[in-house]
Amino acid sequence: GSSSGLISMPRV
């Protein structure tokens, strides 16, 4: 997925 700062979004 992609990580930006404190937010992490898994690839779905």
Curated annotation (Swiss-Prot):
Annotated localization: Secreted
Record Pfam families: Periviscerokin
Chief subcellular location: secreted
One GO CC term on file: extracellular region
InterPro entries: Periviscerokinin
An individual GO BP term: neuropeptide signaling pathway
Disulfide bonds: none
Swiss-Prot/TrEMBL keywords: Amidation, Neuropeptide, Secreted
Sites of Valine amide modification: V12
Function: Myoactive peptide; has excitatory actions on the hyperneural muscle.
Family designation: Belongs to the periviscerokinin family.
Protein name stated in the entry: Periviscerokinin-2
The organism of origin for this protein: Periplaneta americana
Lineage, broadest ranks: Eukaryota, Metazoa, Ecdysozoa, Arthropoda, Hexapoda
